């Protein structure tokens, strides 16, 4: 996963300037992100009370090159990007009181995902 700034940064595309930043951005790949994985993640984070967007403000995911080249559909990938405004004061870099809650939410998602994929 990654995190992103609560405000638009200078290097971002001009089209992002007007967009409201979601709390969670789910980055996908047309080959490696199956619909059921995306739906499950979207539902989980939405039910957790978080605002979710897909491929906004950032798109894509990471797949190791050997698998990407082969387009091996046994490999699944989803990028979970967290708005830093959820868990830290970006001006000072200090954790907010919500840090542990956000961390737990992400840990719980991974547990749910792992159990579902068994």
Q: Can you say where each PLM-predicted feature lies in the sequence?
A:
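Catalytic cores of processing enzymes, dominated by hydrolases/peptidases
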Residues: 1-87
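His/Asp/Glu-rich mid-to-C-terminal helical/loop segments that flank catalytic regions of hydrolases
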Residues: 90-118
């Amino acid at each position: 996963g990654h995190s992103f700034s609560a405000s638009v940064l200078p290097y971002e595309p001009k089209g992002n300037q007007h967009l409201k930043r979601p709390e969670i951005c789910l980055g996908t790949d047309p080959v490696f992100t199956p619909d059921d994985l995306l739906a499950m993640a979207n539902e989980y984070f939405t039910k957790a009370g978080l605002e979710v967007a897909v491929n906004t403000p950032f798109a894509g995911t990471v797949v190791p090159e050997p698998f990407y080249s082969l387009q091996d559909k046994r490999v699944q990938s989803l990028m979970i990007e967290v708005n830093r405004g959820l868990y830290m004061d970006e001006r000072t870099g200090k954790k907010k009181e919500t840090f542990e809650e956000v961390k737990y939410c992400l840990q719980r998602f991974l547990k749910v995902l792992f159990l579902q994929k068994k």
